[in-house]
Amino acid sequence: FLMCVSFSFSCKEGVKEVRVLKLAHGLPPSHSVHLGLLYMNERLKELSGGKMSMDIYSSAQLGSENQCIELLQIGSLDITKVSSAALEGFADPFKVFGIPYLFRSREQFFEVLDGSVGKQILGSTEPYWFRGLAYFDSGARSFYTVNKQIRTPEDLKGLKIRVQKSPIAVEMMKTFGGSATPVDWGELYTALQSNVVD
């Protein structure tokens, strides 16, 4: 996951008004990322002396990840939290995060993200009028199914697996023998109920 910010918001020196930034994401209010964003808002208020705050829109209220990126580009949104898959269509460097088993350990993963390579990737969207601010760790890749345990890649053969809308994710699933089915996070529950995905 990444935090991205629009180039369109500005802070005028000497202005005493509270600057309210609009932030949107697709996760429910109970999700740990949303709780982290609430904490971030409290810190923003504290560190700005009450001159800045955020209105946080969860559960894809303002649209899908791609729609939030588009809102960012036109200045209708100040900050969004999206997956790297949503950014692949804007900047090729984000495709690296879809490659399975790329990093040897969590330590190496964070070493890369916190270093010069991670900073270059965050900045790679600048030609598209937004910039990455920070990375969120969403944990290891996991597969969950309605009625079958997945212990090895071979267990994915023949299953309809929900993937993000990412060419890398689709190709990975094909390599594992599963049927890749791109579904937005907000539509996943319905897709499972209607057997669109397993």
Feature-to-residue mapping (PLM):
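Nucleotide donor/acceptor-binding cores
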Residues: 19-21, 158-159
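Short helix-initiation/N-cap motifs at beta->coil->alpha
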Residues: 57-70, 165-168, 181-194
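Alpha-to-beta junction loops
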Residues: 50-52, 68-82, 160, 178-180, ...
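Short, well-ordered beta-strand segments
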Residues: 22-24, 55, 80, 162
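Extracytoplasmic "Venus flytrap"
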Residues: 22-39, 59-64
